[in-house]
Amino acid sequence: MQKLEIKGGRKISGTIVISGSKNATLPILASTILTNKKIIITNAPILRDVETMVGLLSTMGSTIKLNKKEKKIEIFNHKTLKTFAPYHLLKTMRAGVLVLGPLLAKYGMAKVSLPGGCAIGPRPINFHLDALKKMGANIKIKNGYIVASAKKGLKGCFIKFPKISRCYRKYINSILLCKRKNQIKKLCFRA
């Protein structure tokens, strides 16, 4: 591991502004589906994936104000949202699957396009789908879409990952509204 060592006789002080994280902003945006209250996200990095997620939520019925200069996103879900996330909006990003859990938790159904391309390479979503199935969701893959329902709602359960995972946000989104205690094992919270 590399380090930067500064030697000198003077004390260094000051402040820096840390930019927001795309990988934190995307699940936060998806989780706004769960509330009808106005949500304001500040210090949001306005990158292509964030703009795509904003476009998806807008298409689903969210009222959204995006201020690129202030890096601020205001979201208000004052009406019932559509539970359909089309391919043409999700073909360029993987994070579209993040809306699946909140849609199931709030509306009991969802039809979400399978994730689009990723520069890192293929990253399966089977852990996410298996966890939702364990929580009571009925999930089928039809014509490139995840078709899911949870007519009795999502139920808490014990989830053991087959390996350590950094994709905990997906699961946290899904389990927040479950009616009983949840347990997840082998979950890594390192950045």
Describe each region flagged by the PLM:
Residues 1-191:
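Structural preference for solvent-exposed beta-strand-turn elements
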